[in-house]
Amino acid sequence: MTETERSNESLLEEIENLRVENAKLKNDLCLERSLNNASDLPMSLDEFKRYGRQMIVDETEGLMGQLKLKNASVLVIGAGGLGCPSLPYLAGAGIGKIGIVDNDTVDTSNLHRQVLHDTIKVGMLKSESAKQVLNKLNPHVSVTSYPVRLSNENAFDIFKDYDVILDCTDTPMARYLISDVAVNLGKPVVSASALRTEGQLSIFNFDNVGPCYRCFYPTPPAPTSVSSCQEGGVLGPCVGLVGVAMVVEALKLLLGVYTRENFKPFLLQYSGFPDQTLRKFKMRGRRVDCPACGTGRTVTRESIESGKINYQSFCGSRNYSVLTEDERIDVHKFERDYWNSSKTKPYVLLDVRPSLHYSISHLPNSHNITVNELRDLPADLNNLQSKIPHLSADSEVLVLCRYGNDSQLATRLLKDKFNLKDVKDVKGGFFKYIDEINPSLPKY
């Protein structure tokens, strides 16, 4: 280390010591004023008792720190897997104003991980369900729900009244929008994602000098590589841990723990299996050429609100519409045809869901082969026949998946790659069949 570097390090250490000392003096002065005039306390006696064990932690700066939280506001976008663990800890910590953006409703399939909601709230708006819980948890916190889908048209109006944004969404499209709006308004974003047994989180646009989401990810991922909890699954405690970690970072921002001198861009990664691991990676700072936060930025409020920036087009989407109407049948025709005992040559029913899905619930006499397996097989009918007994070139084949998306891709592959002539996709898939034909089958 050079003499200059040692000198700079010494100065930074001295600045940090002075900051801590200044905070302590402010805290002592605030407390002294409060005690001299008990009728003019900065918080109610209930709040002192409620937050007491938090205030005596050195890192929270005592009463001064608690007043920072009381006067702070946090917007949580998404009251799902990440939002549910985040919200009660924000309210419990005494954040003065909390906003919740979510237009989705509670579903039974959410409850294993979205533990802020419960069985009797199935069908209720998630934002309203969460608001009810927070109001009961801490009456000293003001909670506003926004039961709307966040868009380029409403994001600026919603964001403007909040100090910190928590991005608890689950799509790249939403993350780009949130980051872009936050940069334009000068708001920091705590952003996280979680899937299966893993998760990650970062802070974007710290103090208007930190990198934004576009700096980390200039190009969106291919739509085919993006998986949702609905498709890929998620373990509740794993996403819960990441959501709670988001609150820790939000508190650091609000308490002033991070400064321009000590903040370093990072990516925190959590993995729950096979061993629990938590790793922190140092990331690069702002990109000079970033269109959102760089020197010649083009992602402006006007370009966002006017729709010039098309987030859906930028991020892309999977194209499942690869069949004609003649190549598809509805579940009612499927029910009539598949179980037709008078048919001399039975249909071959292919279920192209992942094998783990298939093991949970499936129709009798079906054969399980995934879309990826079909893609990987050499283009020869003999290879396909080795996987599916009784299949021949003139077989009548019906294809089923979970929702009727992958089955369309599989039908196209069977016809184009393996030259099968009579292949039909079942619209809406296995779940549509359960909903409209046989609700006694397990729906997961």
Swiss-Prot record:
The active site is at residues 229, 401. InterPro entries: MOCS3/Uba4 (IPR028885), Rhodanese-like_dom (IPR001763), Rhodanese-like_dom_sf (IPR036873), ThiF/MoeB/HesA (IPR045886), ThiF_NAD_FAD-bd (IPR000594), Ubiquitin-activating_enz (IPR035985). Pathway: tRNA modification; 5-methoxycarbonylmethyl-2-thiouridine-tRNA biosynthesis. This is Adenylyltransferase and sulfurtransferase UBA4. Pfam families: Rhodanese (PF00581), ThiF (PF00899). It comes from the Eukaryota. One of its GO terms (biological process) is protein urmylation. Keywords: ATP-binding, Cytoplasm, Metal-binding, Multifunctional enzyme, Nucleotide-binding, Nucleotidyltransferase, Transferase, tRNA processing, Ubl conjugation pathway, Zinc.
